[in-house]
Amino acid sequence: MLAAVSDHALSEATMGAYVAQEMATGALSAAQGALAQLLGMPDEGVAFVESATVALGTLLDVWPFGAEPSIGVVPSEWGPNLAAFSRRGLRIVELPVDDDGYVDLAGLERVLASSPPSAVHITQVASHRSLVQPVAAIAGVCHAAAVPLFVDAAQALGHVDTATGAAVVYATSRKWLTGPRGVGVLAVASAWFPGLRRVLEVLEPEAPEEPIGALLSSRESHVAGRIGLGHAAREHLSLGPPAVWQRLAAVGRATRQLLQDLDNWQVVGPVDDASAISALRPTAGQDVMAVRARLLGELGIVTTAQHVFRAPREMRGPTLRVSPHVDTTSDDLVRLRDALGSR
C-alpha cells in the first residue's frame, strides 16, 4: 500500500496530476471494486470523498427526504453525526434499544409501522464502547417497511461484516483497514439510484451522464490515497475477512475479560460483544487525559481519552478507550492491565 501511494505521488510530480490520474484509471476502478465487495454494493454506486464526515454531509445534501424530514437513531449515535442532522433540519426520532444498547428489532418494526422516520441511521460499530449493532437484521426490518437505512461504517469497515443490505454505507480509510488518511467512501445500493439522480440533475443540471458513484465523488481529490485505500481493501480481502473479524472480536473480548476486575475502573458495554473496542469508566476520580498521557509517554501504550461529545445521548462522563488490533498479544493486554492498576 505504501509503495502504491508513493508511486502515484511521484507520477503526479513528474507527469502532472491530471495525466497521473488518467493513468491510474485501472487502479481506481480496482479500488472501487474491492470496496464494493466489502460493502455489498455495486461498483458504480461507490464514491470517493475525503472522510466519513464528508460522506455523511454529501449524503444528507443529496438524499430526497421530502417535506418535514426526520431520521431514526439510537442513544449510542456518534455525536458529530447528530450535529450534522441538526444542521440540516432533520428531526431526531429515537429508536428503541435493549439494556445493552442493541436495537430492539421488534420495537423497530412497531416504530416503522406506526410513525416511520424518513430514514434510519445506525452507527454499526460504536466508537466509544463495545457495541456492534445487528445491522443485517436492522436492514431487513427497514427494507420490509420501505424505509432507507444509512450505515456509518467508519469503525466497521475491516472490523466486522459491512455487506448488510443497507441503502447507504459510508466509511473512512484510516481506521481498521489502516489505509491512508484523507480518504472516505460513500456507497449507495442500486435501488436508490433513480431518486438520487433526479436530485443531482436539479442540483447540477450541467453534470455529465456518469455513474452515481462518480457524481457523488469529490472532484478535487487525494488520488494517491484512493489508490492506497484500494490496496488496503484488497489486502483485507486476501487475508480472508471472516478470519480478521473473528480475531478482532476475540481480542476485544479478551481485553474486556482481563480488565473487568480492575480496581477503580469499570468496563463499559457488554464483555461478549464482537467489537475490538473497549471502554473503561473511571470510578475513583481519575483524569482520563492524564492517564492517556502517562500510558503513552511512559509505556508507549496508545489509548484514547473520550469525552461526552462522542455519544451525548448515552455517555455521562469521560472514559478511556482501548482499541487493540489483530497483532495485539496477551502480553500486551497484561501490560496494559498492570499499568492501569499501578496508580
Report the location of each language-model feature:
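A glycine-/small-polar-enriched, mobile loop at the entrance of the PLP active site in fold-type I
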Residues: M1-Q32
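PLP-dependent aminotransferase-class I/II
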Residues: V73-A119
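PLP-dependent enzyme catalytic core of the Aspartate aminotransferase-like
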Residues: G297-E298, V308-R343
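Conserved PLP-binding catalytic core of the aspartate aminotransferase-like
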Residues: A249-R253, L262-L299
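Active-site PLP attachment segment
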Residues: G165-P205
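Active-site phosphate-binding strand-loop segment of PLP-dependent enzymes
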Residues: G101-A154, G158
